[in-house]
Amino acid sequence: MEANGIENLTNPNQEREFIRRHHKHELVDNQCSSTLVKHINAPVHIVWSLVRRFDQPQKYKPFISRCVVKGNMEIGTVREVDVKSGLPATRSTERLELLDDNEHILSIRIVGGDHRLKNYSSIISLHPETIEGRIGTLVIESFVVDVPEGNTKDETCYFVEALIKCNLKSLADISERLAVQDTTESRV
């Protein structure tokens, strides 16, 4: 058991292996990249039911108010998302790069919008684990993005990491609530 109370089936070596295997990004000059990890007290199937919905990211991403999809959820499908006020953008155009229901991996690339996240791409992968004796999910999300003129790599990574951390916290809150409902309903 780790100091934070998480009994983890995915040891640090397994976590590194998941990152090595699923989170490959080719960086060029003037880009930054980072990988974030979140442990969620809900089974993979519940977390994946939210993450895989390329057509409904607003289900767990608090900064998205609306999403319109052009395509039929195949690789190359494009979505137009409206961003809530308070962020330095109003819309983003994103393309589905990978949707793997067996390995639980989703990858997107931003292809347009009125923001400064140029050449942004991200990969999110889910992995089963045990947390405090219960079935849980290890979520790994990585990204690469151009550093905008006038910003440093650290500033850019900090900004994107803050957005992803908010998304992952929301994903955890919603997934854990759904897991409790699922457990309660299965007892009835």
UniProtKB/Swiss-Prot annotation:
The modification Phosphothreonine is found at T77. The keyword ATP-binding does not apply. Phosphorylated by CARK1 especially in response to abscisic acid (ABA); this phosphorylation promotes its stability and inhibitory ability to ABI1. Ubiquitinated in DDA1- and CDD complex-dependent manner. Ubiquitination leads to its subsequent proteasomal degradation. One of its GO terms (biological process) is positive regulation of abscisic acid-activated signaling pathway. CDD domains: PYR_PYL_RCAR_like. GO terms for molecular function: abscisic acid binding; protein homodimerization activity; protein phosphatase inhibitor activity; signaling receptor activity. Disulfide bonds join C32-C157. Abscisate binds at residues 61, 89-94, 116-122, 141. The record marks P62, I108, V160, L163 as: Involved in ABA binding. Residues 25-176 are annotated as: START-like. Upon interaction with ABA, the 'latch' and 'gate' loops change in conformation leading to a tight dimerization and the creation a surface that enables the receptor to dock into and inhibit the PP2C active site. This is Abscisic acid receptor PYL8. The gene is PYL8.
